[in-house]
Amino acid sequence: MTKNRWIAFRFDNQTRLQEATRSDEFIPDPSLDMEYQRTQVDFGKKGYDRGHLCASADRLYQQEANDQTFYYTNMSPQRNNFNTGVWLALEGQVQSWGRSCTASDTLYVVKGGTIDKEEQVKEYIGGDRSKPVPKYYYMALLFKKGDSFKAIAFWMEHTDNKPAKTIKLVDYALSIDELEEKTGIDFFPSLNDNLENALEATYSTKAWPGLE
């Protein structure tokens, strides 16, 4: 199957920096055989954008890291209105939170699209079922500030609807537990069980500046 399920990265005092420039050179990932990667042909067949999972603007601390965001292994097919609308808006908000990190802070980010359940696949590209298009996209966030933690998730349907003039990201928010139920993924398994259970069961939009 030539589809990435999810990616994970973090913002911290080092990776929050903005010292690189956007390369815009879409290239194959040299670490993976081409038979397991999408190409421009796959995206162009049905008019999909090459949607970044890890955004170019997520990795500006180093040029090599930014260049790697243009690997085809980081691309997911997205309708243009979605890619440049609600997805872009959420990317920008996450980057704002990530770049607020100081020396003792870390924002852990997981992003992905749904391909494992038939009812969560939008369609397939090509003549077989090896290239699914996600019907939903999501993000899971865990913020560590000193000894305190907070978590939140987002779930959005992948449509080609024209974005609203004012995008309310709060409308897409949910708890990590709710996202895990939808995706079947255990997002932050390294946390202490008691802490994980408490963090993932609920969320507060007021705890995330700019969300309300």
Task: Pin down the residues of each PLM region.
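Short, His- and charge-rich active-site/binding loops that engage polyanionic ligands
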Residues: 1-50
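Domain-level detector of nuclease and nuclease-like folds
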Residues: 32-212
